[in-house]
Amino acid sequence: MTRYGFIAMTGIALLAGLGLGTAIARQAAPAAPAAPAAPVPYFVGNRLGMPINPAADGAFNAMSNNVKVYGSVYSAESCSYDPVRRVIVVPNRGVAQNVRTNDAWITFLNHDGSVHTSRWIGVQNPGDQRNMTPPLVLNEPLGSDIINGTLYLADRDGGTGPNDPAVSVVRTFNMQTGAPGRAFRVEKSTGFNDIEVADDGTIYATQTGVGGQTPDPTTWQVWKITPDGNASIFVQGAPLRQPNGIAFDPQGNIVVVNIGTEDVITFSKDGKVVRTEKAVQSGNDGLVIMRDGTKYVSSVVNGGVSRIRSGRNAELIAQNIPNPASMCYDSDENQLVIPMNANNALAFIKL
């Protein structure tokens, strides 16, 4: 009896096990893949308030005016001032291309550095940017400029790994709507640093290139991109030495600062050297030129801001700023605004 009882119980256990296994198998069956979300119209983020993203009915309530918010800047390398909105426009690079692509966004700041709009362009969650009409692509912008209602950004594609070469792309956005416009892709450039844009849409862009112990002068370049997209090298090699900041002087000449020297070099529109001035420090990045020709130069390596006035020696007006990068000029407040790269902050200097 004991023997038969054992067999009977074993049979019950086997049947139960088979039933449980069937149930688990049913539960583990993969669900049918969800249908991809339908594309949504392109949108940008609201200024501080609620909701953050635009509501379908357009409803929005601004943040109360007794609140100030600071921050929203991450790995910013440049800024531009928008005199129409009266805000400082800051491109945030986000994480590097080899971590996640399409991670950049644009912040608007008020004159005192407080946040106006935390994320204007790039408010979407990662991956959602491409599901808009038109899609948003903004990878790792460095230099920036605003001309005739258009935001120009020195961006890049590629660089996600050792077998994915970086390629320079200048992307444009409408300053009223935030919608993407044209993209100027320059296959022969590995990465633009700063840009300056003429009223007719001609773009001048620096490629800093290779310095250090094994410098490569062929990589020190200034490019010119015509409004129809034709790209050519404007200047290459010496007297450039890792060119960085670029701007126009009041005569329409092209002025470039070097990282590798103190030189501030003025080129004519045909690429000839007009003059060479000296900043107080080398390692220069930012360049602002005033209407009277006064130049301000920031050294991302040595932390100072030089002022260069015609017929006078350069002088430091600020010192020991951590990594002051590509400056912009806030004309309404007569101040320099200087992003500080990995310090995730901006410096403000009243003039």
Predicted feature locations:
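A short loop-to-beta-strand structural motif that recurs across blades of beta-propeller domains
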Residues: 102-107, 168-171, 220-223, 263-265, ...
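A short beta-strand motif characteristic of beta-propeller blades
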Residues: 63-70, 115-134, 179-185, 230-236, ...
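Beta-rich, blade/repeat-based domains predominating
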Residues: 72-86, 101-103, 123-150, 182, ...
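Short loop/turn segments that connect beta-strands within beta-propeller blades
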Residues: 109-114, 174-178, 225-229, 268-272, ...
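Beta-propeller domains
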Residues: 90-118
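Bacterial N-terminal signal peptides
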Residues: 9-17
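Blade/loop signatures of beta-propeller domains
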Residues: 39-63
